[in-house]
Amino acid sequence: MSQDKIDIKDVTPKTFNPKTHKGNGDRFNPSNRIYVRESKGTFQKLRRYGGWFLLLFFALIPWIPYGERQAILLDIGNQQFNFFGTTLYPQDLTLLALLFVIAAFGLFFITTFLGRVWCGYLCPQTVWTFMYIWFEEKLEGSANKRRKQDSNKLTANLAMRKALKHIAWFSIALATGFTFVGYFVPMKQLVIDFFTFNANFWPVFWVMFFAICTYGNAGWMRSIMCIHMCPYARFQSAMFDKDTFIVGYDSKRGEKRGPRSRKADPKQLGLGDCIDCDLCVQVCPTGIDIRDGLQYECINCGACIDACDNTMERMGYEKGLINYTTEHRLSGKSTKVMRPKLLGYGAVLLVMIGLFFLQVASVDPAGMSVLRDRNQLFRVNSSGEVENTYTLKVINKSQQVQEYNLNVEGLSDVSWYGKQTIQVEPGEVLNLPMSLGADPDKLDSAITTIQFILTDKSNEFTIEVESRFIKKL
C-alpha cells in the first residue's frame, strides 16, 4: 500500500546566513529582554510626531466641554453616548457598529498598501512603549549602558535611578487609567472624587486596572505583546502581497557583508555596501535582523532604515540599503499600486463611510417608542367608546429643553386621554401613559393600524411610530 508524501520545501530567506545572523536569537523567550538602542532620522521624527498627536488627542478629548456636559462621553450607566451636541442611544448604536467596520477596513486598506505602518507609528502599544523607553534612557542611560548595569550588581545610585524610572512609569500609567475611564465617567468629577476619597468602587477599580495594564504592557512586556499576543501580527500576512510596502534589505547591493575603512573600495575587497555594523538589529524594538528577509515580527517602524541611512552617509555610500520597498521591487520587477485587493478594500471602505454619513444625517434629535398595555387589550369606557391604553416613551437627544406635540392618525373621531403637549429635559426619557378612545361602530375591523406622531414646536421634524388599536372581535 503506497502512501502519499508531502514535499518538503526550504522556505528560509535567501539572505539568511546562520554565520552572519545578528538577530536576537532568543526573542521568542518571553523572559528575554531586548535593549533597544535609540535611532535618529526622518522616520523616527515622523514616529515622534505621530505619537505626540495620538497622546494629545487621547489625553485632551475627555477634558473638552460642550455646553454643560463633556463633549465626548460614553455614559454606559445612562445608556447614552454624548458626541458634542448629539446624544446617541442604544437604538442609534448602528453608527458605532459602522465606525468599527470603517476602522477595520481602513486598517485592511492601509496594511495592504503600506504594511504594518499602524503598528510602527500609531499603535498605542508602540507609542506608550517608546515613551517608557525614553524615560528609561534619560534615567538609566543608553541601551549598552543599561545592559552592562543589569549584568552587574545593583548599586545605591542605580537603585535610586531605577526607582525614579518606575515612579515615572506608574505616573504615566495612572494618568492613562484616569484618561481612559474619563471617556466613560465625567472626567472632572472623577478626578475630584478620586483625590478627595469620595469615588465609588468601580471607577477606582477600572482606573487602577488600566494603570496596571499600561505599566505592565509598556514597561515590561513591550515587544512580547507584538510577537506573541497581538492577533494582527498573525493575520496580517493574509493582506500582504508582493506589492505591499515593507521594510526591506537590498541583498543584491548589500552582500557580501563585512567591515572596511571609509577609504577602502568595497568592490576591490569583494564586499557589498553592508558594513555589518549591527545597528539595524540594535535599534529594532522586536529584536529581528531585517537582513534575514521579511518577518512577521517587523512592525514597519523604520528605525533600522534611519540607522542604516546614517551609517551609509558616514561611509559616503548611497542611502536606501534598507528602505520602504516591495518584494517585486527587490526582485527587479515593477510595483503595481492599483491592484484588485487594494481597490476592493478601498471600495468597501468608501461604501461604509457613505453609509455612516447617511445614517448620521438620518438621526433625529428626538425619539419615541410606543408600548401597549399588556394587561388589557381594550376596555369600554363610560362614554361607550372602546379604549386602548399605551405608554409613550419620548427621548430628547438635544442639549436644550424641548416642547413636543403628540397626535395620532388612522382613527376617525378619536378621543385622546392624556397630555398632547409635553416638555422634555435634555437627555431625559419621558414615560407618558395615555389612552385612545373610539366609537366601535366607526371601526372597520377588530384591529386597526394607527400612527403616533411626534413633532417639535417649530415643526422641523416629525417622528412616526406604528401601533395597533383593538376592539372586541
Region roles according to the model:
Residues 354-377:
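Hydrophobic alpha-helical transmembrane segments in integral membrane proteins
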Residues 439-473:
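Terminal connector regions
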Residues 394-398:
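Asparagine-centered strand-capping/turn motif at beta-strand->loop junctions
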Residues 2-248, 254-256, 305, 318-350:
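Membrane-embedded alpha-helical bundles of multi-pass integral membrane proteins
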Residues 385-390, 431, 445-450:
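Short, solvent-exposed loop/turn segments enriched in Ser/Thr/Gly
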Residues 399-413:
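Short acidic, flexible loop segments centered on an aromatic residue
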Residues 416-441:
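Intrinsically disordered, low-complexity Pro/Gly/Ser/Thr-rich segments with frequent PxxP/GP/PP motifs
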Residues 111-126, 217-233, 264-312:
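Cysteine-centered iron-sulfur cluster-binding motifs in ferredoxin-type domains/subunits
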